[in-house]
């Protein structure tokens, strides 16, 4: 599936028109995750659909969802901008950025320098770079380009093999372990537990996917995660603010 998405991206890049520069303040994604509101930093994801789950949110109002996340004390937001597979759009990110005061991560399949430039222009504070989608040297090149644009990077891996190849080239400040198997789409928090042992101690570790309950939060924290990225389990709730409180065991419905 990832290969298919990358091929689509390559085609999209051929026709990519760069938007006007958004006049919005840059906010540090790294600082927000390093100084969390709770025991773990929360990156709450604004996501309408996905290839594995189909449509997640029918009445999709990205700005309202983002505001509800901020009210629930999310430390940062992640916004899907991939149109073809996730029904996202770059305007969702630009619109959200106008209405919240927390940093916003652009969640997309970034494989080319023009997309880094595009991310900066639409107002992103950080971008996702996927270890399985890029050769380590290419990933490092995009990472450095992002830094020049004052963009932080969440560098995501799905396997120990990818992490080791990456660390042989350079050490990203923020490393995400995605708990979803790229071939089966199944999630297992064991991924975080196993791979976390090999992440250098000074790096900020994010556990992504498959986090639904407070027990899951505790499990990945115990494994060494300093932050979590949660999308689907929050998006499926009617009230995103309450959903965050429930996830962290703060509401009366938590147990």
Curated annotation (Swiss-Prot):
Pathway: Amino-acid biosynthesis; L-tryptophan biosynthesis; L-tryptophan from chorismate: step 4/5. SUPFAM superfamilies: Ribulose-phoshate binding barrel. One of its GO terms (biological process) is L-tryptophan biosynthetic process. The keyword Iron-sulfur does not apply. GO terms for molecular function: indole-3-glycerol-phosphate synthase activity; phosphoribosylanthranilate isomerase activity. Signal peptide: none annotated. It catalyses: 1-(2-carboxyphenylamino)-1-deoxy-D-ribulose 5-phosphate + H(+) = (1S,2R)-1-C-(indol-3-yl)glycerol 3-phosphate + CO2 + H2O. InterPro entries: Aldolase_TIM, Indole-3-glycerol_P_synth, Indole-3-glycerol_P_synth_dom, Indole-3-GlycerolPSynthase_CS, RibuloseP-bd_barrel. Its EC number is 4.1.1.48. Keywords: Amino-acid biosynthesis, Aromatic amino acid biosynthesis, Decarboxylase, Lyase, Tryptophan biosynthesis. CDD domains: IGPS (cd00331). It is an enzyme of class 4 (lyase). It holds the Pfam family IGPS. PANTHER family: INDOLE-3-GLYCEROL-PHOSPHATE SYNTHASE (PTHR22854:SF2), TRYPTOPHAN BIOSYNTHESIS PROTEIN (PTHR22854). Belongs to the TrpC family. HAMAP family: IGPS_B. This is Indole-3-glycerol phosphate synthase.
């Amino acid at each position: 599936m990832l290969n298919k998405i990358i091929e689509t991206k390559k085609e999209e890049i051929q026709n990519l028109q760069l938007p006007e520069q958004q006049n919005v303040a840059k906010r540090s994604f790294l600082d927000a995750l390093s100084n969390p509101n709770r025991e773990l930093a929360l990156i709450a994801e604004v996501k309408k659909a996905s290839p594995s789950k189909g449509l997640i949110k029918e009445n999709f109002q990205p700005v309202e969802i983002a505001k509800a996340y901020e009210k629930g004390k999310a430390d940062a937001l992640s916004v899907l901008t991939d149109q073809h597979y996730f029904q996202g759009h770059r305007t969702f990110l630009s619109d959200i950025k106008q209405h919240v005061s927390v940093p916003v991560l652009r969640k997309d399949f970034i494989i080319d320098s023009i997309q880094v430039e595009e991310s900066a222009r639409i107002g992103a504070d950080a971008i996702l770079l996927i270890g399985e989608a890029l050769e380590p040297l290419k990933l490092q090149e995009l990472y450095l380009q992002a830094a020049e644009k004052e963009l932080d990077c969440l560098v995501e891996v799905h396997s120990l093999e990818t992490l080791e190849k990456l660390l042989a080239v350079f050490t990203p400040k923020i490393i995400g372990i995605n708990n979803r198997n790229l071939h089966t789409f199944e999630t297992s928090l064991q991924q975080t537990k196993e791979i976390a042992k090999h992440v250098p101690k000074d790096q900020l570790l994010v556990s992504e996917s498959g986090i639904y309950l407070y027990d899951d939060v505790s499990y990945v924290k115990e494994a060494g995660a300093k932050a979590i990225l949660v999308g689907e389990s929050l998006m499926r709730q009617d009230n995103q603010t309450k959903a965050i409180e429930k996830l962290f065991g703060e509401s009366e419905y938590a147990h």
